[in-house]
Protein backbone atom coordinates (compact mmCIF):
# COMPACT_ATOMS: atom_id res chain seq x y z
CA UNK A 1 0.00 0.00 0.00
CA UNK A 2 1.22 3.51 -0.84
CA UNK A 3 0.97 5.14 2.59
CA UNK A 4 1.86 8.45 0.98
CA UNK A 5 -1.22 8.46 -1.27
CA UNK A 6 -3.97 11.04 -0.68
CA UNK A 7 -7.63 10.41 -1.55
CA UNK A 8 -9.63 13.48 -2.62
CA UNK A 9 -13.39 13.57 -2.09
CA UNK A 10 -15.64 16.16 -3.75
CA UNK A 11 -18.73 16.26 -1.52
CA UNK A 12 -20.72 19.10 -3.12
CA UNK A 13 -23.16 21.22 -1.06
CA UNK A 14 -23.81 19.64 2.35
CA UNK A 15 -25.13 20.54 5.82
CA UNK A 16 -22.32 21.14 8.31
CA UNK A 17 -23.14 18.68 11.09
CA UNK A 18 -23.14 15.35 9.17
CA UNK A 19 -19.83 16.24 7.50
CA UNK A 20 -18.33 17.27 10.84
CA UNK A 21 -19.49 14.00 12.40
CA UNK A 22 -18.07 11.96 9.49
CA UNK A 23 -14.75 13.79 9.83
CA UNK A 24 -14.58 12.95 13.54
CA UNK A 25 -15.50 9.31 12.91
CA UNK A 26 -12.84 9.04 10.19
CA UNK A 27 -10.17 10.50 12.50
CA UNK A 28 -11.18 8.34 15.49
CA UNK A 29 -11.16 5.15 13.40
CA UNK A 30 -7.94 5.71 11.47
CA UNK A 31 -4.75 3.74 12.11
CA UNK A 32 -1.23 3.66 10.67
CA UNK A 33 -2.49 2.15 7.40
CA UNK A 34 -5.30 4.65 6.81
CA UNK A 35 -4.67 6.83 3.77
CA UNK A 36 -4.87 10.61 4.18
CA UNK A 37 -7.85 12.37 2.64
CA UNK A 38 -8.83 15.84 1.44
CA UNK A 39 -12.55 16.69 1.51
CA UNK A 40 -13.89 19.49 -0.68
CA UNK A 41 -17.31 20.76 0.36
CA UNK A 42 -19.61 23.78 0.39
CA UNK A 43 -21.92 24.15 3.38
CA UNK A 44 -25.47 25.37 3.79
CA UNK A 45 -25.44 28.66 5.79
CA UNK A 46 -24.05 28.11 9.30
CA UNK A 47 -21.99 29.91 11.94
CA UNK A 48 -19.43 27.68 13.65
CA UNK A 49 -17.88 28.57 17.00
CA UNK A 50 -14.30 27.39 17.51
CA UNK A 51 -12.88 26.12 20.79
CA UNK A 52 -11.78 29.63 21.78
CA UNK A 53 -15.10 31.10 20.66
CA UNK A 54 -16.85 33.67 22.86
CA UNK A 55 -20.60 34.15 22.71
CA UNK A 56 -20.28 37.95 22.47
CA UNK A 57 -18.69 37.60 19.02
CA UNK A 58 -21.98 36.23 17.67
CA UNK A 59 -23.84 39.53 17.29
CA UNK A 60 -27.15 38.83 15.50
CA UNK A 61 -27.28 35.26 14.15
CA UNK A 62 -30.92 35.63 13.10
CA UNK A 63 -32.13 32.58 11.16
CA UNK A 64 -28.64 31.09 10.64
CA UNK A 65 -27.81 28.28 13.10
CA UNK A 66 -24.80 28.57 15.42
CA UNK A 67 -22.98 25.26 15.92
CA UNK A 68 -20.16 24.54 18.38
CA UNK A 69 -17.03 23.10 16.76
CA UNK A 70 -13.85 21.66 18.26
CA UNK A 71 -11.54 23.35 15.75
CA UNK A 72 -9.17 26.07 16.84
CA UNK A 73 -10.17 29.72 16.62
CA UNK A 74 -13.32 31.79 17.05
CA UNK A 75 -16.60 32.16 15.18
CA UNK A 76 -16.82 32.07 11.38
CA UNK A 77 -19.47 31.70 8.69
CA UNK A 78 -19.84 29.00 6.03
CA UNK A 79 -22.21 29.26 3.09
CA UNK A 80 -22.67 28.37 -0.58
CA UNK A 81 -20.00 29.87 -2.84
CA UNK A 82 -17.28 29.33 -0.24
CA UNK A 83 -14.87 26.43 -0.83
CA UNK A 84 -14.16 24.50 2.35
CA UNK A 85 -11.21 22.12 2.27
CA UNK A 86 -10.86 19.66 5.14
CA UNK A 87 -7.36 18.19 5.48
CA UNK A 88 -7.29 14.76 7.13
CA UNK A 89 -3.55 14.15 7.31
CA UNK A 90 -1.31 11.90 9.42
CA UNK A 91 1.17 14.61 10.44
CA UNK A 92 3.59 12.16 12.00
CA UNK A 93 3.79 10.14 8.79
CA UNK A 94 4.25 13.29 6.71
CA UNK A 95 6.78 14.69 9.21
CA UNK A 96 4.78 17.90 9.62
CA UNK A 97 4.37 20.00 12.74
CA UNK A 98 1.13 21.87 13.43
CA UNK A 99 2.66 25.28 12.72
CA UNK A 100 4.15 23.91 9.50
CA UNK A 101 0.72 22.68 8.42
CA UNK A 102 -0.85 26.08 9.12
CA UNK A 103 1.88 27.80 7.07
CA UNK A 104 1.47 25.23 4.29
CA UNK A 105 -2.30 25.78 4.09
CA UNK A 106 -1.89 29.56 4.07
CA UNK A 107 0.71 29.28 1.30
CA UNK A 108 -1.62 26.97 -0.65
CA UNK A 109 -4.22 29.75 -0.69
CA UNK A 110 -1.68 32.51 -1.47
CA UNK A 111 -0.37 30.47 -4.43
CA UNK A 112 -3.89 29.70 -5.68
CA UNK A 113 -4.97 33.35 -5.51
CA UNK A 114 -1.79 34.41 -7.32
CA UNK A 115 -2.86 32.23 -10.28
CA UNK A 116 -5.94 34.47 -10.53
CA UNK A 117 -3.91 37.68 -10.27
CA UNK A 118 -4.92 38.30 -6.63
CA UNK A 119 -2.07 39.33 -4.31
CA UNK A 120 -2.59 38.05 -0.76
CA UNK A 121 -0.67 37.35 2.43
CA UNK A 122 -0.96 35.61 5.82
CA UNK A 123 -0.79 37.60 9.08
CA UNK A 124 1.26 36.65 12.11
CA UNK A 125 -1.37 37.98 14.54
CA UNK A 126 -4.46 36.40 12.95
CA UNK A 127 -4.41 33.03 11.12
CA UNK A 128 -5.86 33.03 7.63
CA UNK A 129 -5.15 34.80 4.36
CA UNK A 130 -5.77 38.49 3.61
CA UNK A 131 -5.99 40.79 0.59
CA UNK A 132 -4.83 44.11 2.01
CA UNK A 133 -6.66 44.36 5.35
CA UNK A 134 -9.61 42.22 4.28
CA UNK A 135 -9.86 38.53 5.03
CA UNK A 136 -10.47 36.14 2.14
CA UNK A 137 -9.73 32.78 3.81
CA UNK A 138 -10.33 31.46 7.34
CA UNK A 139 -8.37 28.62 8.86
CA UNK A 140 -8.99 26.37 11.86
CA UNK A 141 -7.52 22.98 12.73
CA UNK A 142 -7.70 20.27 15.34
CA UNK A 143 -5.08 17.58 15.92
CA UNK A 144 -5.97 14.20 17.42
CA UNK A 145 -3.67 11.16 17.64
CA UNK A 146 -1.13 13.04 15.52
CA UNK A 147 -3.68 13.54 12.73
CA UNK A 148 -5.24 16.78 11.51
CA UNK A 149 -8.87 17.51 10.76
CA UNK A 150 -10.94 20.62 9.95
CA UNK A 151 -9.08 22.94 7.56
CA UNK A 152 -9.72 26.13 5.58
CA UNK A 153 -12.59 28.09 4.03
CA UNK A 154 -11.89 30.26 0.97
CA UNK A 155 -14.45 32.92 0.00
CA UNK A 156 -15.01 32.62 -3.75
CA UNK A 157 -18.45 33.74 -4.97
CA UNK A 158 -20.80 34.02 -2.00
CA UNK A 159 -23.10 36.30 -0.05
CA UNK A 160 -20.77 38.02 2.44
CA UNK A 161 -23.61 39.74 4.36
CA UNK A 162 -23.82 37.06 7.12
CA UNK A 163 -20.26 37.94 8.19
CA UNK A 164 -21.72 41.28 9.38
CA UNK A 165 -23.73 39.35 12.00
CA UNK A 166 -20.52 38.22 13.77
CA UNK A 167 -17.06 39.44 14.71
CA UNK A 168 -15.23 37.17 12.24
CA UNK A 169 -12.62 35.09 14.06
CA UNK A 170 -13.16 37.31 17.12
CA UNK A 171 -12.11 40.57 15.43
CA UNK A 172 -14.71 43.35 15.66
CA UNK A 173 -15.10 45.12 12.33
CA UNK A 174 -12.99 42.62 10.41
CA UNK A 175 -13.84 43.17 6.74
CA UNK A 176 -14.25 40.12 4.53
CA UNK A 177 -13.70 39.85 0.79
CA UNK A 178 -13.90 37.16 -1.90
CA UNK A 179 -12.34 36.15 -5.20
CA UNK A 180 -15.35 37.32 -7.22
CA UNK A 181 -14.35 40.91 -6.49
CA UNK A 182 -11.37 40.47 -8.84
CA UNK A 183 -12.56 37.58 -11.01
CA UNK A 184 -16.35 37.86 -11.61
CA UNK A 185 -16.64 34.47 -13.38
CA UNK A 186 -14.91 32.41 -10.70
CA UNK A 187 -16.71 29.51 -8.93
CA UNK A 188 -15.81 26.90 -6.30
CA UNK A 189 -15.92 24.26 -9.07
CA UNK A 190 -13.15 26.00 -11.01
CA UNK A 191 -11.03 26.96 -7.98
CA UNK A 192 -11.13 23.63 -6.08
CA UNK A 193 -8.80 21.72 -8.45
CA UNK A 194 -6.26 24.57 -8.31
CA UNK A 195 -6.44 24.61 -4.51
CA UNK A 196 -5.80 20.86 -4.36
CA UNK A 197 -2.97 21.05 -6.93
CA UNK A 198 -1.20 23.77 -4.94
CA UNK A 199 -1.58 21.82 -1.68
CA UNK A 200 -0.20 18.66 -3.28
CA UNK A 201 2.74 20.63 -4.71
CA UNK A 202 3.65 21.89 -1.22
CA UNK A 203 3.37 18.30 0.08
CA UNK A 204 5.98 17.30 -2.56
CA UNK A 205 3.53 15.85 -5.08
CA UNK A 206 2.35 12.67 -3.32
CA UNK A 207 0.36 10.14 -5.38
CA UNK A 208 -3.33 11.02 -5.23
CA UNK A 209 -6.71 9.91 -6.50
CA UNK A 210 -9.97 11.80 -6.99
CA UNK A 211 -12.86 9.64 -5.80
CA UNK A 212 -16.19 9.87 -7.67
CA UNK A 213 -18.79 12.07 -5.96
CA UNK A 214 -21.31 9.91 -4.10
Curated annotation (Swiss-Prot):
The record marks 135 as: Lowers pKa of active site Cys. Gene3D superfamilies: Bira Bifunctional Protein, Domain 2. Substrate binds at residues 71-78, 138-140, 151-153. It holds the Pfam family LplA-B_cat. Pathway: Protein modification; protein lipoylation via endogenous pathway; protein N(6)-(lipoyl)lysine from octanoyl-[acyl-carrier-protein]: step 1/2. One of its GO terms (cellular component) is cytoplasm. It is an enzyme of class 2 (transferase). Its EC number is 2.3.1.181. The active site is at 169 (acyl-thioester intermediate). Residues 32-207 form the BPL/LPL catalytic domain. Its main location: cytoplasm. It comes from the Bacteria. Coiled coil: none annotated. One of its GO terms (molecular function) is lipoyl(octanoyl) transferase activity. Keywords: Acyltransferase, Cytoplasm, Transferase. It is found in: Cytoplasm. One of its GO terms (biological process) is protein modification process. InterPro entries: aa-tRNA-synth_II/BPL/LPL, BPL_LPL_catalytic, Octanoyltransferase, Octanoyltransferase_CS. PANTHER family: LIPOYLTRANSFERASE 2, MITOCHONDRIAL-RELATED (PTHR10993:SF7), OCTANOYLTRANSFERASE (PTHR10993). Belongs to the LipB family. Catalyzes the transfer of endogenously produced octanoic acid from octanoyl-acyl-carrier-protein onto the lipoyl domains of lipoate-dependent enzymes. Lipoyl-ACP can also act as a substrate although octanoyl-ACP is likely to be the physiological substrate. In the reaction, the free carboxyl group of octanoic acid is attached via an amide linkage to the epsilon-amino group of a specific lysine residue of lipoyl domains of lipoate-dependent enzymes. This is Octanoyltransferase. The lineage of its organism: Bacteria, Pseudomonadati, Pseudomonadota, Gammaproteobacteria, Enterobacterales.
